[in-house]
């Protein structure tokens, strides 16, 4: 058919405009993100009724199809538009299974345009489906034969629920009287997979059912263990004797499979599994229970820390410490004789001697009354309160000491021989104190409530006294700060009892060595100045005893006045309330007063006048070092934001605390112990006038105790702060004395 020129020109203009519009639409679609639903938006991109065989994806296919259509239109030029016949592009589609509704996985919203439908015009959009057909399960042909079927439930779980992670409730297995051939049928779903194993055999012979069940169980165990081990990332070898499977598989948040089931689990446990978790809270991720490696077991079990060499070392300390203290004290009881003596152990079995000479009822009653009075004063008198993170402490040792000194002075003024009574029964009081330490430790071990809480409601138990060994726990104490009715700290009571006892002994020796003259007859012109001068010129005293007792008094008053510095010490915060601590508190007064007692009984003269000055200077130096270091640490623990700590050097720890590197704490690790040791050496220095071993060994025991405590504190800090303490140790290498210890 022929067309006029005008008609042809109109067709050409129409085709050009149509091509430009389609090109503009294609450019817009190429510039913006494509969605799957955009395939049906253009009139030229309608899907054909027959599927295309072009192997392209959705987005690529959309662009390709659009480009192909535009090219075909441009090639046609001014020719007349024709519609392609559907029969030319018809391709017989291969048989495909019914896939059902496709699950939408895109997070984008659905398009408002309807599904793709064939319009019968234009080229079709080739789309390749990415869904694979399910692989059919091969079936094994069965041989008809007489069958005896026996069903047994194997006690194990093969798979887990994929939606909830919970295990299957049952696992059924049917076994037949043969082990030669078997058919395995697997039924799977979206959530649970259950295996059913059937073994069919020919013949009517008897078959060992237990043997078949055992072989099936072993094979399934190996397959399940291999599957779960591959999922976990670590191969696990299981044996029949060393493997038993749990009812659910827990997923750990750790990669090393050393996390417990409590760490993370997506399963829904039943009642039986909850009982198992209560019995064993730390189980490996591994599906087996008994196939854990020794390395995993060692990581699970936390060994109790050991001090003093275990139970044997603790037993030797409990036996030798009170014996040594009593022997050294007993060796210097007689006048003009302070030397080692032979022990008569048979006296310990003589009940009459112990009753008449040692445990006299009047002396025992006085000692018990003294302890009760000190306890009441500690509980009732006000004191300085120090608020720390874990506990609030009250320190009133100074008030207790002043009260007892005033009461003793009044009693002495009223002609009650308090000083004479105290010094006469010095050795008996030493025995009573050592025995009382064992009694108090036993009472604390058996009767004190171990569930007392501090201000943060945390138990104050001693980890080093929870070993399970009676000797170790009794020696080190199961608690840190037990309290009576939540008010009186037993450790502080024993500490103050030790300080007050030492103070009383020092004042008694000073009072006893001073021989006051009779009261002068004052005239009308003489006043108080004349009276003071009279006593100064006529008083009699022993210089060595007075000097030694004065040094001891100065040493004890320093500890009493600055008692609140104890709140940041190792002794109050970390030392357990055990028998060893109580023995030290009971023995300290008699070890410290051994030198003063020696000078009081031996009457040793001072041969050189500058000796007291050297001793006083050494004592002042030691107390200054001790007090400065303790005060520095106390103020920092109490308020680390103080301006005096603005530019100090510290090491941060993972526990939130800091290790001091400034002041004396950056010079040695325990400067307070260094000052205490120097002060003790000053107390023992007067023994150079007339040496004697028992008093010197008594003070040496306290020095050895401080050295041992420094070692214990270093070990505990190493176990607590780890790498932070390692860095601190590299900078501060010495414990007490630089380049020596």
UniProtKB/Swiss-Prot annotation:
Residue ranges with Polar residues bias: 160-184, 231-240
Compositional bias per record (Low complexity), positions renumbered to this chain: 57-84, 109-126, 185-194
Membrane topology: Multi-pass membrane protein
An example Gene Ontology molecular-function term: DNA binding
Taxonomic superkingdom: Eukaryota
Assembly with partners or alone: Interacts directly with LAM.
Name listed for the protein in its UniProt record: Lamin-B receptor
Pfam family, one: ERG4_ERG24
Gene Ontology biological-process annotations: nucleus organization; sterol biosynthetic process
Gene3D superfamilies with a match to the protein in the record: 1.20.120.1630
Phosphoserine: residues carrying this PTM: 111, 144, 223, 225, 243, 246, 248, 250, 263, 284, 291, 298, 640, 642
GO cellular component, one term: nuclear envelope
InterPro entries: ERG24_DHCR-like
Keywords associated with the record: DNA-binding, Membrane, Nucleus, Phosphoprotein, Receptor, Transmembrane, Transmembrane helix
Composition bias type Acidic residues, residue spans: 267-277
Native organism: Drosophila melanogaster (Fruit fly)
Membrane-spanning ranges: 308-328, 363-383, 402-422, 429-449, 497-517, 543-563, 577-599, 604-624, 687-707
Modified residue annotations for Phosphothreonine: 135, 234, 237, 266, 288, 293
């Amino acid at each position: 058919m022929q067309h006029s020129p005008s008609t042809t020109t109109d067709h050409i203009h129409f085709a050009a405009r149509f091509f430009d519009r389609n090109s503009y639409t294609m450019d817009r679609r190429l510039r913006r993100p494509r969605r799957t639903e955009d395939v049906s938006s253009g009139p030229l991109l309608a899907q054909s009724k027959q599927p295309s065989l072009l192997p392209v994806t959705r987005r690529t296919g959309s662009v390709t199809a659009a480009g192909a259509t535009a090219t075909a239109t441009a090639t046609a030029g001014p020719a007349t538009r024709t519609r392609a016949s559907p029969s030319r592009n018809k391709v017989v589609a291969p048989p495909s299974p019914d896939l059902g509704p496709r699950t939408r996985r895109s997070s984008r919203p659905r398009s408002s345009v309807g599904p793709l439908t064939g319009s019968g015009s234009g080229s079709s959009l080739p789309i390749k489906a990415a869904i694979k057909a399910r692989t059919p399960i091969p079936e094994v042909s069965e041989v008809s034969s007489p069958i005896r079927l026996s069903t047994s439930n194997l006690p194990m779980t093969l798979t887990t629920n994929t939606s909830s992670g919970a295990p299957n409730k049952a696992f059924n297995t049917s076994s037949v009287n043969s082990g030669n051939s078997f058919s395995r049928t697997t039924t799977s779903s979206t959530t649970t997979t259950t295996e059913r194993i059937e073994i069919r055999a020919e013949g009517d012979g008897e078959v060992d059912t237990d043997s078949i069940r055992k072989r099936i169980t072993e094979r399934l165990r190996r397959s399940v263990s291999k599957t779960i081990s591959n999922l976990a990332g670590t191969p696990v070898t299981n044996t029949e004797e060393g493997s038993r499977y749990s009812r659910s598989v827990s997923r750990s948040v750790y990669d090393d499979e050393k996390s417990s089931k409590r760490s993370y689990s997506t399963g829904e446990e039943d009642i039986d599994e909850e009982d198992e978790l209560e019995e064993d809270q730390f189980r490996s991720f591994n599906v087996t229970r008994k196939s854990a490696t020794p390395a995993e077991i060692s990581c699970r079990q936390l060994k109790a820390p050991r001090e003093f060499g275990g139970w044997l070392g603790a037993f030797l300390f409990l036996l030798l410490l009170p014996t040594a203290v009593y022997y050294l004290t007993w060796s210097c009881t007689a006048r003009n004789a302070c030397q080692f003596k032979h022990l008569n152990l048979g006296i310990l079995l003589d009940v009459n001697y112990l009753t008449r000479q040692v445990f006299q009822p009047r002396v025992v009653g006085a000692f018990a009354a003294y302890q009760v009075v000190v306890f009441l004063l500690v509980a009732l008198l006000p004191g300085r309160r120090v608020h720390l993170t874990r506990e609030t402490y009250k320190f009133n040792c100074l008030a207790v000491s002043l009260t007892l000194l005033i009461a003793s002075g009044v009693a002495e003024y009223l002609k009650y021989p308090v000083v004479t009574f105290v010094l006469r029964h010095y050795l008996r009081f030493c025995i009573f104190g050592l025995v009382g330490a064992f009694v108090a430790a036993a009472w604390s071990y058996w009767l004190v409530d171990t569930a007392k809480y501090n201000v943060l409601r945390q138990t104050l138990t001693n980890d080093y006294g929870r070993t399970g060994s009676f000797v170790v726990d009794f020696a080190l104490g199961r608690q840190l700060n037990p309290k009576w009715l939540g008010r009186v700290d037993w450790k502080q009571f024993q500490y103050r009892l030790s300080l007050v006892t030492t103070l009383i002994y020092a004042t008694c020796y000073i009072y006893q060595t001073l021989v006051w003259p009779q009261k002068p007859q004052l005239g009308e012109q003489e006043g108080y100045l004349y009276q003071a001068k009279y006593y100064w010129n006529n008083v009699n005293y022993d210089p060595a005893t007075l000097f030694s007792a004065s040094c001891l008094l100065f040493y004890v008053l320093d500890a009493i006045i600055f008692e609140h510095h104890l709140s940041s010490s190792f002794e109050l915060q970390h030392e357990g309330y055990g028998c060893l601590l109580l023995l030290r508190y009971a023995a300290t007064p008699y070890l410290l007063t051994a030198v003063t007692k020696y000078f009081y009984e031996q009457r040793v003269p001072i041969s050189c006048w500058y000796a007291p000055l050297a001793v006083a200077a050494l004592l002042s130096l030691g107390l200054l070092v001790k007090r400065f270091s303790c005060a520095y640490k106390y103020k920092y623990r109490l308020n680390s934001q103080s301006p005096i700590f603005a530019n100090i050097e510290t090491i941060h720890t993972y526990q939130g605390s800091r290790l001091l590197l400034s002041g004396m704490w950056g010079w040695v690790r325990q400067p307070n112990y260094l000052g205490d040791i120097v002060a003790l050496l000053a107390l023992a220095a007067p023994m150079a006038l007339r040496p004697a071993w028992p008093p010197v060994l008594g003070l040496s025991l306290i020095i050895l105790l401080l050295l041992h405590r420094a070692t214990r504190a270093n070990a505990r800090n190493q176990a607590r702060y780890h790498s932070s303490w390692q860095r601190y140790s590299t900078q501060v290498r010495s414990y007490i004395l630089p380049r020596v210890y």
